[in-house]
From Swiss-Prot:
GO terms for molecular function: glyceryl-ether monooxygenase activity; iron ion binding. A motif (Histidine box-2) lies at residues 145-149. It comes from Homo sapiens. This is Alkylglycerol monooxygenase. Changing H149A: Loss of function.
Length: 445
């Protein structure tokens, strides 16, 4: 029998306690995997609430927002892309875990025991530490994780900048738990470990006193996101910072942190944000002579090269001055307003798609996913001021009208159905004219 809580909304108290990992074992222990709520999905309104609170606090304390609009849109875009595969497949982190549990478990810990709950808490957090560390020390794993580090801002939207690829290696580090921790208990802590890490992506919280000794905090995680030399490969913790202190990877925040990749990618285009390092590995692999050197390109650190230590040379990491200017869009304010409106519409269709997944045909589901990806890519092109941005936006608006006409996209407000068609027809005409100018003369700026 399914637990009613799996279908119910969480209270305000539960929502914030989910984010701070303070839910009690008695209210988060379930006998079967099917009973486990989708805590990440239920946390969405609390993500939004904290992001708005961060905005207000930042204005009060610093007189400015906590980040830039174009960077925030790119971070949320990455989060959207990372969740799209779950529309078609069950998470590999769960699938692999269930397989090991059903075929190779050594013994069963009771699912309703607080000791099992706390053991899973420690086990998942320990597994996360080692996954996270390897995601920085193994180049092919860094190809996925670098997405999260590509933001040059550090705020709550940065927490949403997730990788499409990362999940395909992270499951390995949690697999040993399947020898004795029931899948339902694991699924709870896998979500809570992720949710906890949302609120630590902020600059509006300074030092948390004694909690800094035990927990991963905004201060500790700011160091992890820094590209200063003293920040590189430090503070891998998920929840407990003690792992870094035990294994020698801890570093306290002691100077202004400059965020982002050591070699910034300077784009807001989400596909490039996700996959650019894979192309870099591919190019380096073929340019590097020798079988063992090629092997090392894939499995040693991102900074490795022939004749260098496994993790590369720290002196090759570019120095920072603290005066670095983050990459920003040169688009007009009017264009930014347009992208925000289109992004908001896409999010509405995205949420509706997840809510109605069971009722949608595979064709409709696939077309919606294609539209979402095209929308995110087109917005990235517009913010980057790419030469072919107008052409892509024309095609995107045309696709919207076609999906709308053939019933693959529902009107968000039925009474405004005609208005939507008129607005998108105008957009097609506008961007179509821009496209013709691009094709016949110079790129539009």
């Amino acid at each position: 029998m399914k637990n009613p809580e799996a279908q119910q909304d969480v209270s305000v108290s539960q929502g914030f306690r989910m984010l701070f990992y303070t839910m009690k074992p008695s209210e988060t222990s379930f006998q079967t995997l099917e009973e486990v709520p989708d805590y990440v999905k239920k946390a969405t309104p609390f993500f939004i609430s904290l992001m708005l609170l961060e905005l207000v606090v930042s204005w009060i304390l610093k007189g400015k927002p906590p980040g830039r609009l174009d960077d925030a849109l790119t971070s949320i875009s990455a989060g959207v892309l990372s969740r799209l595969p779950s529309l078609f497949f069950r998470s590999i982190e769960l699938t692999s875990y269930i397989y090991i549990w059903e075929n190779y478990r050594l013994f069963n810990l009771p699912w309703d025991s607080p000791w099992t709950w706390y053991s899973a808490f420690l086990g998942v957090d320990f597994g996360y530490y080692w996954f996270h560390r390897m995601a920085h020390e193994v180049n092919i794993m860094w190809a996925g994780h670098q997405t999260h580090h590509s933001s040059e801002d550090y705020n709550l939207s940065t927490a949403l900048r997730q990788s499409v690829l990362q999940i395909y290696t992270s499951w390995i580090f949690y697999s040993p738990l399947a020898l004795f921790i029931p899948p339902s208990v694991y699924a709870v802590h896998l979500q809570f470990n992720l949710l906890y890490q949302f609120w630590i992506h902020t600059e509006v919280i300074n030092n948390l006193g004694p909690l800094e000794l035990i927990l991963n905090t905004p201060s500790h995680h700011r160091v992890h996101h820094g590209r200063n030399r003293y920040c590189i490969d430090k503070n891998y913790a998920g929840v407990l910072i003690i792992w870094d202190k035990i294994f020698g990877t801890f570093e306290a925040e002691n100077e202004k942190v400059v965020y982002g990749l050591t070699h910034p990618i300077n784009t807001f285009e989400p596909i490039k944000v996700q996959f650019h390092h894979l192309f870099s590995i591919w190019t380096t692999f073929w340019a590097t002579p020798g079988f063992f050197n090629k092997f090392s390109v894939i499995f040693k650190g991102p900074g490795w090269g022939p004749g260098k230590p496994r993790l590369g040379l720290s002196e090759e990491i570019p120095e920072v001055t603290g005066k670095e200017v983050p990459f920003s869009s040169s688009s007009s304010q009017l264009l930014k307003i347009y992208t925000v409106v289109q992004f908001a519409l896409m999010l509405a269709f995205y949420e509706e798609t997840f809510a109605d997944t069971a009722a949608l045909s595979q064709v409709t589901l696939l077309l919606r996913v294609c539209f979402i990806i095209l929308t995110l890519t087109s917005i990235g092109f517009l913010l980057d001021q790419r030469p072919k941005a107008a052409i892509m936006e024309t095609l995107r608006c045309l696709m919207f009208l076609m999906l709308y006409r053939f019933g693959h996209l529902k009107p968000l407000v039925p009474s405004l159905s005609s208005a939507f068609e008129i607005v998108f027809s105008i957009c097609i005409a506008f961007w179509g004219v821009r496209s013709m100018k691009q094709l016949t003369s110079h790129p539009w700026k």
